[in-house]
Every structure is written in C-alpha cells, then in structure tokens.
Swiss-Prot record:
PANTHER family in alphabetical order: INSULIN-LIKE PEPTIDE 1-RELATED, INSULIN-LIKE PEPTIDE 2-RELATED
Top-level lineage group: Eukaryota
One CC-aspect GO term: transport vesicle
Keywords: Cleavage on pair of basic residues, Cytoplasmic vesicle, Disulfide bond, Pyrrolidone carboxylic acid, Signal
Record's protein name: Molluscan insulin-related peptide 1
Length: 123
C-alpha cells in the first residue's frame, strides 16, 4: 500500500469526531434543567410540604409582590369550569410527566433552590 494517500473531508472528520465523543460518553450540554423522578427522595436541604408553601409566601411578600392566598371554598363553587368533566383517558393525560417541565417540588424539595427560583412561583 505504498504511495496511497488518504484524503479526508471536513464533514468526514467531524462525523468521526462526534462518533468518538458520543461513544466515550461525552454528551452535549443540556443546561441546568433536570427533571424529577417519582423515585426521588427529598434533599436534606430541600423544603417540602407546608414549609415550602410558607417559604414561597415569604419570598413573594418580601419582593413586594402579593403573597399567595388559599382559595375560599365558596369561591371554588363559583368556578364556571367546575361542571366540566373529562373522560378517564383524557384526565390521565394530565397526570403523565411532560418532557421539559418542572415544578416547585422538583426545584425546592427534591433539591435545594434559590430565592430567585422561589420567586418564579409568585402569583
């Protein structure tokens, strides 16, 4: 094979490089987002339950925004949407995990969160 010269194009080299990187476990950056799993346990510094609700209330009131308030039962009865019913199949779609979503329990109970993250949940 003397005298054989291999010529590689840029596209070929990029393909080979990406293939090697993916095979050794290097993954593209996905940002700071991480979803919670049903099997996750609360973080030791996470805040959960009524303590989390109180903390959000405090964070929202300390940022000059109106605090979260519990709804009144009478107000719930006046809700024009209260008589709308969904089929079981349709209702279950709301319970399945949606890709790319997170919530306050995931952000502040399953792991510790910042004041800035808490304030994102102010009404």
């Amino acid at each position: 094979m003397a005298g054989v010269r291999l010529v590689f194009t840029k596209a070929f080299m990029v393909t080979v490089l990406l293939t090697l990187l993916l095979n050794i476990g290097v993954k593209p950056a996905e940002g700071q987002f991480s979803a919670c799993n049903i099997n996750d346990r609360p973080h030791r510094r996470g805040v959960c339950g009524s303590a989390l609700a109180d903390l959000v209330d405090f964070a929202c009131s300390s940022s000059n925004q109106p605090a979260m308030v519990k709804r009144n039962a009478e107000t719930d009865l006046d809700d024009p949407l209260r008589n709308i019913k969904l089929s079981s199949e349709s209702a279950l779609t709301y319970l399945t995990k949606r890709q790319g979503t997170t919530n306050i329990v995931c952000e502040c109970c399953m792991k510790p969160c910042t004041l800035s993250e808490l304030r994102q949940y102010c009404p």
